[in-house]
């Protein structure tokens, strides 16, 4: 928080978050503080897998089991379960065991919606495990996208393959590779880069171990990785293609500063303001965007998804809250 602030600091706040507060207005720091406190009561959320079911079927099955839920107006496949419902309850459902639903936070559902991959497009998920966003891209494109999913960790690649199979996602090219070293032979219409980060947006008040995880050493490591991943992504992105960069961080070093620096290095790339999509047409070919993407832009505008001021105009910083983890999204287009 700013010097001279009288706001009580968040108890046992990791140093990285405290440093971020120092660069913010008191109002924004207080909103984030409140979000971290409310996160302790964050409800379980899940996504209906459109490759295997419909939102209405999921609603019907949840009702039959007496599980309270709320639908999300900006994404028909998203469900917020009632107070007291735990993940264990979902694990026991046939819906879950059959791959008809996937446990996924609301914030992590945002990147595939913002990317808005076209049906039949060549899509790269650069850091794909455990597969939630990969499978969501497949569902949003009706299984027509040609998806390449990168994961350099063998155990995580196995988990990715298992989840995609369970969710009915077929034909994905899983590459056991470091996405920072992808050959320039490859090229993609759309790229999702949900980059490794400090995870500061996921902090919850009372997490005493976060101080040991969220360190300056980790930030230095993730920032180097993010830079390399962004450079490689913008290299293998086709002209006219789009890259969605995201993190679950509230730190400018991982968000706006990374994106601004990448745009300086890649002069043929520019930001596509996410709220512009509310008009319902893509800026390159005037074809209507999916209704879910238009609804997402509207939710950013009307406050249904709480946001903070972003340093790079047109990008979105989701404020931590009871329902949302702190998250950052930037949509970049290559000329």
Predicted regions and their residues:
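S-adenosylmethionine
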Residues: 1-335
């Amino acid at each position: 928080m700013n010097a001279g602030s009288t706001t009580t600091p968040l108890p046992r706040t990791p140093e990285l978050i405290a440093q971020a507060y120092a660069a913010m207005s008191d109002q924004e720091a207080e909103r984030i503080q409140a979000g971290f406190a409310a996160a302790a009561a964050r409800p379980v959320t899940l996504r209906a897998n459109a490759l295997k079911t419909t939102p209405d079927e999921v609603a019907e099955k949840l009702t039959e089991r007496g599980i309270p839920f709320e639908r999300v107006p900006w994404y028909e496949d998203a469900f917020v379960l009632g107070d007291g419902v735990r993940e264990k309850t979902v694990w026991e459902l046939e819906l879950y065991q059959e791959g008809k639903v996937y446990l996924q936070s609301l914030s992590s559902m945002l990147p595939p919606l913002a990317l808005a991959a076209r049906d039949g497009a060549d899509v790269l998920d650069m850091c794909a495990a455990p597969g939630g966003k990969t499978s969501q891209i497949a569902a949003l494109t009706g299984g027509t996208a040609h998806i390449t999913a990168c994961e350099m960790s063998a155990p995580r690649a196995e988990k990715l393959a298992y989840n995609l199979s369970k969710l009915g996602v077929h034909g994905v090219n899983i590459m056991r590779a470091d996405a920072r070293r992808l050959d320039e032979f490859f090229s993609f219409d759309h790229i999702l880069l949900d980059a490794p980060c400090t995870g500061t947006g996921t902090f919850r008040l009372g997490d005493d171990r976060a101080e040991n995880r969220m360190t300056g050493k980790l930030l230095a490591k993730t920032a180097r990785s993010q830079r390399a991943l962004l450079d490689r992504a913008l290299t293998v992105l086709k002209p006219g293609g789009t890259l969605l960069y995201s993190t679950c961080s509230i730190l400018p070093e991982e968000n706006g500063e990374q994106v601004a620096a990448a745009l300086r290095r890649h002069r043929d790339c520019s930001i596509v303001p996410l709220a512009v999509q509310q008009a319902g047409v893509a800026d390159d070919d005037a074809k209507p965007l999916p209704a879910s993407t238009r609804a997402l832009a509207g939710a950013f505008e009307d406050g249904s998804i709480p946001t903070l001021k972003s340093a790079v105009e047109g990008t979105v910083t989701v404020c931590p809250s009871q329902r949302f983890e702190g998250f950052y999204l930037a949509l970049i287009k290559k000329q």
